[in-house]
Amino acid sequence: MQAEFKLRSKILLQPLVLLHIIDAYERRPKDCTQVIGTLLGRNNPESGHLEISNCFTLLHKDYPNSDRIDVDLQYANDMYELNQLTYPQEKIIGWYATGKEVSRSAVNLHEYYARECADGNPMHLLIDTSLRGQRMMMRLYTAVVMGVPNGTKGLMFSLLPVEMSSGNPESVALNLMKKNALQPTKQVGRILPELVQVVDITRDLQTKLDLVLRYVNETLARKRTPNNTVGRALHDALTSVPLVDAESFRMMFNANVRDMLMSITLATMIKAQLKISESVIAMPDL
């Protein structure tokens, strides 16, 4: 029954999950041909859809030409318990793997995650990192029991509908990454300071506000035909913003800037500490 529900429902995938999988694949050991990990998610009560919102990588060992796979279960349990301390609403909903097709070890992994999932029917996210056709293909499966009654039975992995979903913070980050990728003359990997990004976003917001004011003035002057859809959208946008005076807005803006500067300082300190730690670890033994 759960499998039938998933086959008909829409699954939403957060960009953070893909970025985590790509990072894990780039950092994999040299003797590993793929990476696998646990998918975490939650049910969205507003939309009624299931969201894949997080994941973590598993330590494992593959055996070529065999369906055997060894997984560090203690590490998996520890990672899940640590994640529950911060995000208790995220539960295990399946696993992910990199590759062009479903591996021979998928059945064994399905049996393990069937015990870990609340509904007993985990999902399998397959990411093709070979970039065939300059695209990273992703497919989501659910296992359906097939076979003859009172006879031999097996599993068939059926495709599930999956869509990318992102909120406002994720959209800002994705737009920035896309903007940097479309500028080949820019230094690769270089990200502008946060304050410069705030200035750019503020400038874009001012441009959009000027466009809205021009539309409203032209409509009031009867130079443009009124559009009820646009009017309702503007009304919803304006009523969603609380009405505050200039002094209160200035104080809130300054407080947010101070918080951002503190975050930048802490992030810089952590980055410097990580670089020092990597340098110390890479030093040869004396």
Swiss-Prot record:
> Has keyword Protein biosynthesis?
yes
Keyword vocabulary terms for this entry? Cytoplasm, Initiation factor, Protein biosynthesis
**Which CDD domains does the entry mention?**
MPN_eIF3f (cd08064)
Do you know which SMART domains this protein is assigned to? JAB_MPN (SM00232)
Q: Where in the cell is it found?
A: Cytoplasm
Q: Which residues form the MPN domain?
A: 11-147
Q: What is its main location?
A: cytoplasm
The cross-references to Pfam families, in alphabetical order and at most eight, read:
JAB, MitMem_reg
Q: Which GO terms describe its biological process?
A: formation of cytoplasmic translation initiation complex
Recorded GO cellular component terms are: eukaryotic 43S preinitiation complex; eukaryotic 48S preinitiation complex; eukaryotic translation initiation factor 3 complex, eIF3m
Any idea which GO molecular function terms this record carries? metallopeptidase activity; translation initiation factor activity; translation initiation factor binding
What is the similarity comment for this entry?
Belongs to the eIF-3 subunit F family.
Q: What does this protein do?
A: Component of the eukaryotic translation initiation factor 3 (eIF-3) complex, which is involved in protein synthesis of a specialized repertoire of mRNAs and, together with other initiation factors, stimulates binding of mRNA and methionyl-tRNAi to the 40S ribosome. The eIF-3 complex specifically targets and initiates translation of a subset of mRNAs involved in cell proliferation.
**Subunit info?**
Component of the eukaryotic translation initiation factor 3 (eIF-3) complex. The eIF-3 complex interacts with pix.
Q: Which PANTHER family match?
A: EUKARYOTIC TRANSLATION INITIATION FACTOR 3 SUBUNIT F, EUKARYOTIC TRANSLATION INITIATION FACTOR 3 SUBUNIT F-RELATED
| Protein name per UniProt | Eukaryotic translation initiation factor 3 subunit F-2
User: What is the native source organism of this protein?
Assistant: Drosophila willistoni (Fruit fly)
